[in-house]
């Protein structure tokens, strides 16, 4: 069985963290002792690992102290949420452009989107409708072309001059 990374917060720990954030049960006061020293005095709650602490200083500025793995987890969750939103918007905009096969267009668009991934691992914030329209220009075979589909050639009597009634009997 694969071990989870050490920095991952377990469900019970994350529940405790959420509880400590919502109840603000751990409160402390920060006093300046000297130019290089500060005293952190617990006013309410207890110092426990994986819980948040709400700190006020002598100037009534408020701070929240959380474990570093929580910040990493929050950043990762924010990145995943952004990418999920981007993919959902991309799928919505694909549908508006009348794909012949939605899954094919979705795969092409996701591959092209992955090519835009930045060096830091994040996807850029793009206009998904313009992105899909560009794909439609570059790959018109993936989309219905209603303009050509419903256009009929103008009626021309000459097209029917060679029509032989005997051909009707063969049908």
From Swiss-Prot:
Pfam families: DUF2603 (PF10788)
InterPro entries associated with the record: UPF0763 (IPR019724)
Superkingdom to which the source organism belongs: Bacteria
Family according to the record: Belongs to the UPF0763 family.
Protein name: UPF0763 protein KHP_0657
Record organism: Helicobacter pylori (strain 51)
């Amino acid at each position: 069985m694969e071990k989870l990374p050490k920095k991952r917060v377990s469900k019970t720990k994350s529940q405790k963290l959420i509880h400590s954030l919502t109840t603000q049960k751990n409160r402390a006061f920060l006093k300046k002792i000297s130019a290089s020293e500060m005293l952190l005095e617990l006013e309410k709650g207890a110092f426990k690992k994986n819980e948040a602490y709400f700190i006020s200083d002598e100037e009534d500025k408020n701070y929240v102290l959380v474990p570093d793995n929580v910040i990493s987890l929050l950043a990762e969750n924010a990145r995943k949420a952004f990418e999920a939103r981007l993919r959902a918007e991309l799928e919505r905009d694909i549908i508006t452009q009348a794909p012949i096969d939605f899954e094919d267009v979705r795969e092409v668009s996701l591959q092209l989107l992955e090519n835009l991934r930045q060096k830091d691992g994040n996807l850029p914030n793009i206009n998904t409708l313009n992105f899909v329209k560009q794909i439609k220009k570059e790959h018109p075979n993936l989309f219905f072309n209603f303009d050509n589909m419903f256009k009929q050639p103008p009626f021309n009597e000459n097209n029917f001059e060679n029509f032989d009634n005997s051909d009707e009997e063969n049908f």
